[in-house]
Amino acid sequence: MSIRSFAHRILRRALPGFVRRSYLAKFGVALLAVVVCISAAGGVMYLNTSEHLQQSSRTELKKAAELSSSAVDNWHDERTNNARMLAQYGVFDNDNATEVQQFFTDEQHHLPSDVRDIHYVSLTDARVITSTDAGLRNASFGSEAAPWSRQQLTPGDDGVFVSQPYVNDGITEVAYVARVSSTPGRRTAVVMTASLAAISSSFWDPTPHSFTQLVDGTGSVIADDSKRATRQPYVENATSPIVGARAVGFQPAAQAAKEMDQAHETAYAPVDGTPWVVTLHVPTSEAYGLASNMAENVLLILGIALAGLVFIALTLGRGTVRALNDLEAKAAALERGEYDTDLDVARVDELGRLFEAFASLRDTVQARIRDANEQQVDAEAARSEAEAAQADAEAAQAEAEAAREESEAQARRLETTAEAFSETMRAYAAGDLTVRLDADVEQAAMADIAAAFNEMAADMEATIADVVAFADEVATASTDASDSAAAVEQTGRDVSDAVGRIRDRAADQRDQLEAVASETDEMSATIEEVAASADQVAETSQRAAALGDDGQAAAQDAVAQLEEIEDETQAAATAVDDLEAKMSEIETIVAAITDIAEQTNMLALNANIEAARADQDGDGFAVVADEVKDLADESKASAAEIEALVAEVRAQTETSVAAMDRIQERVSDGVETVSETERSLSEIAGRIAEADTGVQEISNAMDDQAASVSDVTTAVGDVAALGEETATEAESTADAAAEQATTLSDVAAQTETLAEHAVALREHAAQFEVAADNEPGA
């Protein structure tokens, strides 16, 4: 016993009698079972697949909003650090507006392009000291050109105040205010303005028609994909729960704004440290496009399968059953002897030819009956004539009896053939499509009926075989879909593995960032030690500058004293020169006295001569002459002594003059040398002062660098924390990928279920017995 025969017997026992007796009932029950199975499997698969894919789409949209929020947070932190570092430079120590302006101009070339202007402001005087914007220099707060100045500029705990976004020249900006700590006694700050339009380049839009907006705490749009946001009201209005949200969320299309031209799904994520929220709007048709496409494909497959079954039921099933019922009824009428039954039909297929064969059979039976009746009439006539001719009557009677018996035998054979045909047709109507009428009969009409019926049965058997083949094709397609789902499942698992590797790499990056943070801490400690050494050098430089100033003062005192000595030496030299002049005058006088003495001697000699001439009368005159001579001799001797003394004094005076000249020259040289020394000391003092200023700037720079390195250390710590968050998000993404792989496994399982239902369809169709050569694959 074959498996098919065993299954057929089981089905016959399980099905009610009216179903087993009716081909239409069997066909309807089989189709209904297949429709119910396919519909149930398709509905479950549609609902599960749609729900899982929609949940996955929502998760991806929230991830996209978080990525955009993280990018805005990084941009905001970078601009905050830019403003803080600008305020820590030493250029503000001298409070020189020109130097600060030049510094701002140079620094602006190194800052990001979205930094529009840098201002140096006095919070005490409420005015702009200098700025890269020439129109704001020396301007007071509250200017239309400086909307940020109309806000309360109060730096927060991190030393930087962030203004509310404002519109300036059609561009939405935000100002970062950092307090300058190197101007004691004055409250000054650096104000850096940045355009929020640059943020839009970091927005992540997952679909072609999605758009992203950055909304502040007042419900105004401060940045969007168009880069033209000017604080227009948020599309969902300021009372939306999205405005001011503090956690990542999702808003379905049912709650989206009525102002949009179509339904949108909205994902949002707050920006840490700000009242800003990133909102991602995606059309519902794009957000769930994959889910809709897959659901439509599933429904399309189910629709095609159901439409095919309905088409088969309406075309083949109902028409065939109706024709068989009519044929059965008319065959029963013929069996009852109702030979006037109408067997004309409009069909031209096998069933139509079967009706024609039954009509031919009816006509043949009627002709035979007429022949039998005519033979019976002839027999009666012959029996009447037998009275006239005994010998001929007996022969005729015997012949008539034989003819009658032959006619009755033919009628019995025809009745037997009709009963066999009727039994075979009942078996065929019960579902056994393998039965055939015996065409090898002596009646030509019955042979034609058998041939037509057998042709119709063969076509019906082929039709049922086609139904079985269709079920096989559905099973094969379901198997292929199952294989495709398995391939997609494997792809999902590959994606899950790739995300796992990304998670591992994110963990490695987190470890590297922690190592960098540790190295940065060590570098910060080293720079603080260098800053301490720079402070010691600055103190030494200040002491050297003080000693240089003392040396310069001492040199200046020495120059003053040498100049006084030079003046006194000059005065002494002048006095010696005057003495020398007086000595020259004395020499002149001594020369005159000597001349007078010589003349006096000459007079005395002349007097003695005259006295000698006068003899005794000239004694008195001689005495006088002697006295005069003696006096002249004494005067000459005194003049000689004076001359000798004057010569000695002159020689000493010349020596003194030469010495004074040499002293004056040396004093002059000393004054020049000391002056050069004083100039050198002055230059040295200036250089020491400059060096001290440089050392002080180096010390301040080292302090600033230490602070900057501390900020960098903090930033590296933040990056390390971000790496930790990235690793965590990678793990979450890996879990989501694993969940998606599980979902695909469910889809594969449901596809296998569809294949099983297709097999069930084939089994239902297999309850109709067909020949082995008509089976699929035969």
Curated annotation (Swiss-Prot):
On whether Plastid is a keyword of this UniProt record, the answer is no
| Membrane-topology annotation of the record | Multi-pass membrane protein
The record's listing under Pfam families reads:
HAMP, MCPsignal
Q: Report the PTM annotation.
A: Methylated by CheR.
Coiled-coil segments: none
Keywords assigned by UniProt?
A: Cell membrane, Chemotaxis, Membrane, Methylation, Repeat, Transducer, Transmembrane, Transmembrane helix
Q: Which GO terms describe its cellular component?
A: plasma membrane
One Gene Ontology MF term:
transmembrane signaling receptor activity
Q: Compositional bias (Low complexity) at which positions?
A: 387-400
Q: Predominant location of this chain?
A: membrane
GO BP field: chemotaxis; signal transduction
Transmembrane region(s): 27-47, 297-317
- Methyl-accepting transducer domain sequence ranges: 484-720
What is the official name of this protein in its record? Transducer protein Htr4
